[in-house]
Design a protein with these regions (language model features):
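Short hydrophobic transmembrane-like helices used for membrane targeting/insertion
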Residues: 1, 12-13
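Targeting/processing segments of secretory and organellar proteins
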Residues: 2-3, 7-8
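Local sequence-structure signature of Cys/Sec-based thiol-disulfide redox active-site neighborhoods
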Residues: 13-44
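Short alpha-helical
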Residues: 29-30, 57, 82
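Thiol-based oxidoreductase modules, predominantly thioredoxin-like and allied folds used
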Residues: 45-58
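Short amphipathic alpha-helix with an adjacent loop that forms part of the alpha/beta core around
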Residues: 59-65
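Structural micro-motif
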Residues: 65-73, 84-85
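Non-catalytic, surface beta->alpha helical segment in thiol-disulfide oxidoreductase systems
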Residues: 76-96
Length: 96
């Protein structure tokens, strides 16, 4: 499968059957806020964690998805979500 439509279809199918993805890097203050929320809610198993500083492939994926490397970025079946406060609010609404 190729092209934009094929890639987006794969993306939706992948996220439907797999964990959410969190693009982050360790020393990002905003990322730490989201990571602490995930730990507090005990939902780490719901995620694939992608540290963009450890693996440059993840940074490229993030650029392909959003046009930049701003983290944290939560990716779920609805697409990418940025802003730590929005991500935290979403997680609490879904898992509390």
């Amino acid at each position: 499968m190729g092209g934009l439509l094929g890639d987006r279809l794969f993306f939706v199918i992948f996220l439907t059957y797999n964990a959410m993805e969190l693009y982050f890097y360790e020393d990002c203050e905003y990322c730490q806020t989201v990571l602490k929320t995930i730990t507090k809610l005990k939902i780490s198993d719901e995620f694939t964690f992608k540290d963009i500083r450890i693996n440059p492939v993840y940074a490229k994926e993030l650029i392909d998805l959003t046009g930049n490397v701003t983290v944290p970025c939560l990716v779920n079946a609805q697409g990418p979500m940025k802003e730590a406060k929005d991500i935290r609010k979403y997680l609490v609404s879904q898992f509390v």
